[in-house]
Amino acid sequence: RTIPRRVLPLYREALSFLVTLLDSDPDSVGLWKLLLIFDALILAPESASESFRDAIKRRVALFRAGAWEPLISDELKGRSSGPQRDNQSLLDVGDPKLVSALRAEKALATRRSRSGASAALSAPANPKASKPGDLLRAFEKLNPQVGQPSLTADKAARRPLNPPEGELPAPIEFSVEEVMKRVRSSNKNSAGGLSGSDYQSLSAWLHEDDDLTRQLVLLLNRIAAGAVPPAIVGLLTAGRGVVIPKDEIGGLRPIVVGHILLRFVGSLALAKEAPAIRDFFLKPVPLQFGVGVQGGCELMAAAISSFLTLHPGAIDIGCDAQNAFNSWDRTRLWSPLERNFPGLCSFGRLLYGSSATILFAEEGVSGAASVSNNVGSRQGCSWGSFCYCLALHGPLSTLAGEFPDLLVLAYADDVHIVGPPARAVKAYNRWVELYESELQGNLRPDKSVCFAPGVPLEVVAATGLPVKSLECPSGMPVVHDGTRVLGAPVGSLPFQAQFASERVAEICADIETICLMPTLQHQNCLATGSTVHRINHLLRNIAGGELDPFAPVAAAYDRAVLSVPRRLAGMTALSGSTERLASLPGRLGGLGYTTWSQSADSEFLASYVHISHAFPSLFPGLARVYPSAHTLASADEARSVSQPALHAFNALARLVSRAPSVAEVVRRDAAKPIKQLQHAFTLALASADQEDLLLALVTASPHHPRAA
């Protein structure tokens, strides 16, 4: 919750009092504990007879006086069963879509969370209630333990942690400017951990560049250096366990919310080391695109597609590892971390050098339940993906070195092996060995996919790959028309169109649910602030402006999006000029209901320009599939190069015909990230549309107010 401005100075003064004491005695376990529960004591929910502001004022006075009993009593009273009562009341609602709409409304109204509201739209409306013990079993299943048998063929015991001992290299340090910049850009709706602190309260801690902020930066640097009393490490690494229903029949998805201080320091460290991290994973051979790589998904999908285009008869094996992030061997982390990122070693040892505890409450079970976490990535950790990718990089480099003729790529745990069938299958079998021996994990053929465009099933089966069939249900599925790479369709245009149709159907269903939300303002907020942006990833990976394959799905999407402002206006239909105005961005006087027809070319061209700029250094052998868009002189020339080149030429031509400045942006800003390119293209196009709309209004009605 946002701390009221009138009491913010009081709140920070009390915090400053505590931090000053801790600064003078940094090894005091008691002061560290008090810091970790500061927000839980001061910001606990207020009673019905008291405002939040008055509650903070009263608690700060109690805190300064050392009156712990009433403070703790306040905190305990705040632990009500509100969410359970709310869920119970929704059981009386018969329409599942209305239940989802009401939950989305509440997420916006009470938490101001568009991401939470968006998730509520497609969440199970009335999932089967869990039984006592279900949550514990779900967390235990997701958290294997050191010493237990691993998932490898020999069932070897999981190795102990074995963190580095003794003095470590000099730790990373952060400046006041770096810390304040990071906290201001953080997601204030991100959940807090066990301590009661979140990014909202952390922003209040670091509200301005003053003595308190400078002391807090020193404290954050102590955490980054691992200079924390041993008794506090377990409190910092403990996580709040939450289980989310994933279907209507009782399936559970356990998640963990880590401590905000560790998450913040971790994100600071990764941001500061971003250039080194990117170079490590991409040089001398580009292997890992899941950490620190701008447009990593688009680059990887384009590389796989380009390789298959240039090597007819090649296949792509997308590998799936069972419980990948939660089951890798942590001993494979220490050596590459110290060798390549010495400044991160101390913080890495703090995060992963000992067993962490996941605490959660289970309905029908008294007290708190707990599960240890000492294998794989810590859930709720901002370093989870980085550490997994770092441990994976050794065996991945070995595989790429042994098969230099193949394309071996990964996006976190999503590993792809591309090449001639016999070689690709041989590499896959080798990857199974490496993954088992190095990370103590296992691959699941039945969840992996072999994409074999133009390669008969018999040819794939002849390589020795266990192919899924009635006789071998646990074998690997083989597809021929297309595959999904990180949410991007790779394959034929009909496959891409079908993939897009399914994705659009999901978004349209959510738009229908949005229209059931009671408040019109919340409908507008969620639709324009979240839902219309969900199409962006798809449009960056398909040539959505090509009408032949995508016209039907584009029309369906645009109808659904524009139905929201039509219903908000209480009209059965909107005029063409009204629809154009509604689809303009807010900065240009519109409502922000961006349509497929407005954004498809901008999204695809931004992705293409980024890929064409990156490929010559990353994939020289594939770069000819993605020549610079502005160098293509004609459609015939582009067609002779590749299908992506033709689509980029067409998209650029369509954009330039409406907004000529796009051509200069393509030449000037090719090195910029995809999002910045897309925003530049979209703004140029929207500005041109705005001018055309104003001209049309003035022409139709010279006395129109906008004619002034």
Model-identified regions with their sequence ranges:
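Surface-exposed loop/turn segments and immediately adjacent short secondary-structure elements
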Residues: 1-233, 237-240, 313-315
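Extended C-terminal regions of large enzymes
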Residues: 39-111, 117-124, 569, 573-708
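Catalytic palm active-site di-aspartate
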Residues: 193, 238-241, 253, 269, ...
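Basic, alpha-helical interaction scaffolds
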Residues: 403, 469-546, 607-614, 618-621
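Short, conserved micro-motifs composed of acidic
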Residues: 424, 442-481
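Inter-domain linker/hinge segments that demarcate the starts of reverse transcriptase
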Residues: 213-226, 271-273, 300-309, 424-440, ...
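Catalytic palm subdomain of template-directed nucleic-acid polymerases
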Residues: 323-341, 408-411, 415-438, 456
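Conserved pre-catalytic core of RNA-dependent polymerases
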Residues: 162-382, 386, 390-394, 603
